[in-house]
From Swiss-Prot:
The gene is mrps17. It is found in: Mitochondrion. The keyword Manganese does not apply. This is Small ribosomal subunit protein uS17m. InterPro entries: NA-bd_OB-fold, Ribosomal_uS17. GO terms for molecular function: structural constituent of ribosome.
Length: 165
């Protein structure tokens, strides 16, 4: 059952389309570049197509892209509120050659790292919940002990009052 789910997720990961664009800005935000992807929009009134480029913030895991690079990006890799794409590979480098830059990890490596981070987060959450449950149990035991001490003190007081009478 688990292996079929894992296989299905691996297949669904590979179903994303590939977009090609030019790196507009790089180096301003760590592990993030802005990529302009070309496109067209049809104007119904003029019955004509106009250029309508889109700009995306793209996850660059090793800061290996430079402004002017032509890259292939893949949507569907959500890393933050505004980053929804990841670099797949460099098509045409601008400036320094690809060999002199840090390597771009493969998509499988990225997904494995993301899954490992998610598993570690889940493990930390389970440990935190166990810790909170243990602290609550200790607090409850302390409250019960204080209540028992008060109860014993009250009974001793009542007994001492009955002996005086």
């Amino acid at each position: 059952m688990a292996s079929t789910i894992a296989a299905a997720t691996k297949v669904s990961r590979k179903m994303f389309r590939e977009l090609h664009g030019v790196v507009v800005t790089s180096g301003l935000i760590d592990k993030t570049v802005k990529v302009r992807v070309g496109g067209q929009k049809f104007n119904k009134f003029l019955q004509k197509h106009f250029d309508d480029p889109k700009q995306y913030l793209v996850h660059d895991p090793n800061n290996s892209l430079r402004a002017g690079d032509v890259v292939a990006i893949m949507p569907g890799f959500i890393t933050s509120k505004s980053k929804r794409h990841v670099v797949k590979h460099i098509i045409a480098p601008a400036g320094t050659p690809i060999e002199e830059r840090p390597p771009i990890p493969s998509l499988d490596e990225l997904w494995d790292a993301k899954d490992a981070a998610k598993a570690a987060k889940k493990e930390r959450k389970v440990l935190r919940e166990k810790m909170q449950a243990a602290e609550e149990a200790i607090e409850l035991a302390e409250r019960m002990a204080r209540h028992a001490v008060r109860e014993i003190a009250m009974r001793e007081k009542i007994i001492s009052l009955q002996k005086v009478d």
